[in-house]
Design a protein with these regions (language model features):
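Beta-strand-rich domains and repeat architectures in extracellular enzymes and scaffolds
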Residues: 33, 41, 53-87
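C-terminal motif of bacterial Sec signal peptides marking the signal peptidase cleavage site
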Residues: 13-14
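Sec-dependent signal peptide recognition
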Residues: 1-7
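Short beta-strand elements that form the blades of beta-propeller/WD-repeat-like
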Residues: 78-83, 125-131, 171-184, 240-257, ...
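Surface-exposed loop/turn elements that mediate protein-protein interactions on large endomembrane-trafficking
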Residues: 42-64, 90-104, 137-153, 187-228, ...
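Blade/loop signatures of beta-propeller domains
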Residues: 20-55
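Structural signature of eukaryotic scaffold interfaces centered on beta-propeller domains
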Residues: 70-73, 117-123, 162-170, 221-243, ...
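Blade-loop segments of beta-propeller domains
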Residues: 59-64, 68, 97-124, 131, ...
Length: 426
């Protein structure tokens, strides 16, 4: 068997209990100050957030030849992979052994043609596939179809936006949408986060507070299904379920919220302060942006841990990784160089500009860098490595020269990387 894909999985510190962080301290909402007394550092260490590092080569069989990974989840006993081509979910053990496929392609009951995403409830041993033609379908871990919990029309009617996310936490479902919109809606229906009941009916809608007062402009600048237009779009809402607590940060806002299940409310957990200029709203939210729009500061995602909150932002072609200390309120900043890429697209006279904003830590547990490609179950961060890939691979020489806490883990990583490089291509 040949191992083509390699996962570095870290378990976050502080995930052994079910204790949830209180949303508001007695002294009020903690403020993460990104403009005062910030210490710039050359690197941020993975060991500050991680309890342990696992090196997992995925077993390749005739039934599990994966070209790449488009979506994945790690649970306590399994690894779940979508590689975006055959529309099945591939189940592996936590050591990387292939177990079975989930899903059934077709037009009949319990079947689907394609799907958008999937979620896993390990307690119930259920996999939820969000199909594009047959609603939400539930399968057991062996791949057997169990039931349909929402039909196609319910799913289509729920959203008015191109960009959507589903979340499963504590056996409860939630949904998120971010514009661009693809159809007109009433401005009161321009929601950003929604809690769902067991039948996927909306329980309570929440708005991104930045949208208030801008609803008519957002709706007017929607995508046009008949012709190409430079519609408005926003970055995805950043969501985390660290230690069982659902938290989120809407794009363009300065608050991290936590969801309170007892009251079905979003409560402020952290306020973010910066005196950086954020730029004109329209210019920074066009699909095809002018180069100058990248010169403004913005926070795109955050990652909570036991002792720290990491925030990922950018200004110009630099990626800013902030590390906020929960105990003393101090903030460290590490800057990395990125690059704005340009791609010509038919029907437009100017290029589509994009920039990667990776969350990268110094892997002092195993060597090299650790890029958080995925996070899962509120307790795992995953770095996906692809032999031969220019972007998703590690320089073995860099690992060999790294200073690490555990030399045996470093040797294991080097051995697995060298083996994968030799054996990956049939």
């Amino acid at each position: 068997m040949k191992s083509i894909l390699l996962l570095l999985i870290i378990t976050l510190l502080g995930c052994s209990s079910n204790m949830k962080q209180e949303p508001i301290s007695k002294s009020g909402i903690p403020v993460i100050n990104l403009s005062e007394d910030v210490s710039t550092v050359p690197s941020l260490l993975l060991s500050e957030a991680a309890e342990k590092l696992e090196i997992v080569p995925l077993e390749m069989t005739d039934e599990s030849v994966l070209s790449d990974i488009t979506e994945m989840q790690v649970t306590d006993h399994n690894i779940w992979i979508d590689h975006g081509r055959e529309f099945y979910i591939y189940r592996f053990s936590r050591t990387g052994k292939f177990l079975n496929r989930i899903g059934s392609i077709g037009q009949g009951p319990g079947e689907y043609v394609n799907y958008l995403t999937f979620l896993v409830d390990e307690d119930k041993k259920e996999v939820y596939i969000f199909s594009t033609n047959n609603g939400v379908l539930v399968y057991d871990f062996e791949g057997g179809f169990k039931k349909q919990i929402s039909d196609f029309q319910t799913m289509v009617g729920m959203f008015s936006s191109i960009y959507k996310q589903y979340i499963l936490n504590d056996h409860k479902f939630f949904a998120i949408q971010n514009f661009g919109l693809y159809r007109s809606v009433d401005k009161d229906s321009l929601w950003s986060f929604v809690s769902l009941d067991d039948n996927f009916q909306k329980k309570r809608l929440f708005k991104n507070p930045v949208h208030v007062g801008k609803e008519e402009q957002i709706i007017a600048n929607r995508a046009n299904m008949d012709r190409m237009v430079n519609y408005w779009m926003e970055y995805l809402t950043s969501v985390d379920i660290y230690n069982g607590q659902l938290t989120l940060k809407y794009p363009d806002t300065d608050t991290i919220y936590c969801y309170d299940d007892a009251t079905n409310q979003l409560l402020p957990q952290y306020a973010i302060f910066t005196d950086e200029e954020k730029g004109d709203y329209e210019a920074t939210h066009l699909w095809f942006k002018d180069r100058k729009a990248f010169d403004y500061f913005s926070i795109f995602s955050y990652y909570p841990t036991k002792d720290f909150v990491y925030l990922i932002g950018s200004k110009g072609e630099e990626v800013y990784t902030y590390c906020y200390n929960k105990k003393d309120g101090s903030v460290r900043l590490q800057k990395r160089q990125s690059a704005i890429t340009e791609r010509d697209v038919p029907w437009f006279s100017f290029p589509l500009r994009q920039m990667k904003r990776d969350f990268v830590l110094d892997n002092d547990l195993g060597g090299g860098d650790f890029t958080v490609d995925s996070r899962s179950s509120g307790k795992y961060w995953i770095d996906i490595l692809e032999p031969g890939g220019d972007e998703n691979w590690i320089d073995i020489d860099q690992i060999k020269s790294s200073t690490v806490i555990d030399e045996s883990k470093k040797k294991e990583l080097i051995r697995v990387l060298e083996s994968a490089t030799e054996d990956s291509n049939p």
